[in-house]
Amino acid sequence: RQGVDVSMITAAAGARVMSNALETREKAAGLLEVDAVPPVQDRKAFAEQIRRALYAAKIVAYAQGFSLLRDASERYHWSLDLGTIAAIFRAGCIIQADFLNDITAAFRRDPLLGNLLLDRFFHEKIAANHQSLRSAAASGIRTGLPLPAMTNALSYLDAFRSPHTGANLIQAQR
């Protein structure tokens, strides 16, 4: 209803629903076989790539969540202080990640920040890690490993940084 892209949150919810369908997935596994996946050659490098990919995806997830809060605050005239919200999460929420300190700092630098990805700290982190996200998502797709949140993070980044989205193609088909 807010008109904010929260595709990672939606993908995570969908993955949770799918995880509950064990019996159906077991039946499908016997019917819809995929080719064997070759083993990873360099486990240490692969683990580092996954760590970096997850970090980039986490930034996108928080960017989407805080964009949703920003939009709701503007739409409903709530005057939410997003930096304070991040600090509250850090102090007493189940999340309590050190990463929330970086979010608090971003909103302290710019209280009107529309998206975390526009903050220098976060766009530098994305620049340093987005290729790992792209490689990890591609590996998952190649091997048939479902990575809905990770692939949505990559799609979001690609759409967010592009002045022209696929909507132009949809409009051309009308």
Segments from the language model and where they lie:
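NAD(P)-dependent dehydrogenase/reductase Rossmann-like domain
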Residues: 1-174
